[in-house]
Amino acid sequence: MAGALEGIRILDLSWGIAGPLGVLLLAEQGADVIKVEPPGGDPFRVYDGYKVWTRSRRSVTCDLKSDAGVDAFRKLAATADMLVESLRPGA
């Protein structure tokens, strides 16, 4: 049985607990979630619950501080229906 969000692509730039848990609910409803991580990975990978919070999604590394990384992210964003982020203001 298809989920309610089947066919929806979400880019996940969130970190911590709240963002990934919110996106997890969307993924469990059938959304195609792609987690965009900085080089070196998400700093929250060290926590035991990380694999639970970020299940049901694919992951890519993208350096948003480089021109090549920004270009790659823009191409990826052009294919997405939604973007979830938890960046600090002005980032």
Residue ranges and their predicted role:
Residues M1-A91:
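N-terminal helix-loop segment corresponding to the beta1-alpha1 unit
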